[in-house]
Every structure is written in C-alpha cells, then in structure tokens.
Amino acid sequence: MSPFSIVLIGFAMSTDAFAAAIGKGAAMRKPQWRDALRAGLIFGCIEAITPVIGWVLGRAASSYLSAYDHWIAFVLLGALGTHMMIAGLRNGPDDANDAEAKTPKRHGLLGLATTGFATSIDAMAVGVSLAFLDVHIGVVAVVVGLCTFSMVTAGVMLGRALGNLIGKRAEILGGLILVIVGSVILYEHLGAAT
C-alpha cells in the first residue's frame, strides 16, 4: 500500500471524529488551544489503537464487528448527543450576566474517550481488512492517529467559532451534530447492507 493511500485512509477514518469535534467545540465555553489539543490527543490515540485491535482480531471477528459496529456507534453517539441537547435546553436563555456562561466548560476525559471510541468503531473494522493486505499496521496506526489528532484539534477550534456565534445554545448544536453523525453511520451501514 502506498504512503499516499495510507494518508487517505487516515483522513477518511478521521472524518467522523472531525464532525464530533466540531460539536464538542461548539458545546464548550470558549475552548482554548490546550482543550483542542487534549481532545485531539485523546481522539487520535483511540483512533490509532482501534485499527490495531481490528487487525489483531482478524477475519474471525470481522463478521461480528461489521454486523453491530454501526449500531454501537449510533447508540453511543445518539445517547451522548441527546444528553448534550437536554443539558443545553436546561441551561435556559442566554444571559450576559450569567456567571456560568463566563466559566469555561471542559468535557471530561470519559466523555471525550466515549465519543472518540464511538467515532472509531469503523476503524476497527478497517483494521480487520488491513490484516489481509501488505501493510505495516504500526505505520497505519501512527498515520491514522496523527490525521485524527489534527482533524479533531481543528474541529474543536472550528466549533469554538460556531459556539461564540450562537451562545449557550451551542451545546444543543453540538448534541445535534453527534446524533447526526451517529445516524449517518447507521444509514451508511444499513444502506450498504441492502
């Protein structure tokens, strides 16, 4: 497999994470570069590990994973997105004097890791297919991790810009994006199955 193909795989596998990162960045209150880099590192590490896991599991797990990966991603992203939308609705209308609105909001490690895992389940299935190609899985994992790191970091900062434009309702937008990403994953897999 050519280096160009590996980089294309890396960016293709990071698109779901990028979309989720835009949602996370929009939901955060003024995320700083360190927040974006932290999210990028968490997503990048998870996205790098999952194809290796898939590669190790090999052909035996392929049919099991491909049968359920889209449902797992849909449920995880749907639940996280719904939770974010409900939290955004409970926050009430924007208030310039609201002390909470001035306090930066960070997403916890568990929330970022769960979202990172949900957006990387497909990468595990790709890893299974890579087990049958002439490719060094370590190189692929590093490239995928770096691509995801850069895409998620950029996504969080892009989400910040969107969040500043729409205020506290950004959490609703972020949750909606996660639900849409999960729904698209489900739709793509169900559409491919027919």
UniProtKB/Swiss-Prot annotation:
Keyword set, alphabetical order: Cell inner membrane, Cell membrane, Ion transport, Manganese, Membrane, Transmembrane, Transmembrane helix, Transport
PANTHER family, per the entry: MANGANESE EFFLUX PUMP MNTP-RELATED
Gene Ontology terms, MF aspect: manganese ion transmembrane transporter activity
Function as written in the Swiss-Prot or TrEMBL entry: Probably functions as a manganese efflux pump.
UniProt-recorded name of the protein: Putative manganese efflux pump MntP
Ion transport recorded as keyword: yes
Topological type in the membrane: Multi-pass membrane protein
Record-level GO cellular component terms: plasma membrane
Stretches that traverse the bilayer: 3-23, 37-57, 69-89, 110-132, 147-167, 172-192
Subcellular location: Cell inner membrane
UniProt similarity note: Belongs to the MntP (TC 9.B.29) family.
InterPro entries reported for this sequence: Mntp/YtaF, Put_MntP
Name of a matching Pfam family: Mntp
